[in-house]
Amino acid sequence: SDIRFEQNDGRSTLKFLLVHGSPRSVNEYLLEDHDREDFVQLLLENDAHVMAFGHSHKPFDKVIDASRNAKLNDYRHVFNTGSVGKPKDGDVRACYVMLNVIPNPNPKLSHRYMVMPEFVRLDYDVEKAAKAVEASVLPDEFADMLRKAY
């Protein structure tokens, strides 16, 4: 399942798509080195200018120059939101994204806005969370995953 919304100022519409894994599958991993052309295709097929996803729990953002594709004439944005509860990027802190939409200074592009995700990191008591996992029915290796952020 996905969430879609738009920002419209009367002159242009910015279309957002939020998914867990990808628009194709909740279990698909979209990693930072994912093929650029496939990102463009996903955005085009889903009529989105901005796509946010998770699943891999590895935060990144990527601006895609879609003007090289004949069907698009602007830049698109994809980003992985990271993870609040189970980071896998080596940083044990919780990670979430604040999405900033600002006026676009380039009048040649079709959209009047730029999207700038801000990754926010928060400290929390990782050891307390890991011990709670160990005291539960969950496998102890999950506690180690929290401690090591993998």
Q: What are the residue ranges of the model-derived segments?
A:
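Active-site flanking residues adjacent to catalytic metal/cofactor-binding acidic residues
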Residues: 19, 54, 81
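Conserved catalytic scaffold of divalent metal-dependent phosphoesterases
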Residues: 1-50, 66
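Short gly/pro-enriched beta-turn/loop segments at secondary-structure junctions
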Residues: 11-16, 46-47, 53-56, 73-74, ...
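Active-site environment of divalent metal-dependent phosphoester hydrolases
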Residues: 24-26, 51-67, 86-91
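Short beta-strand scaffold segments in enzyme catalytic cores
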Residues: 1-5, 58-63, 95-99
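Acidic, His/Gly-rich catalytic cores of divalent-metal-dependent hydrolytic chemistry
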Residues: 64-150
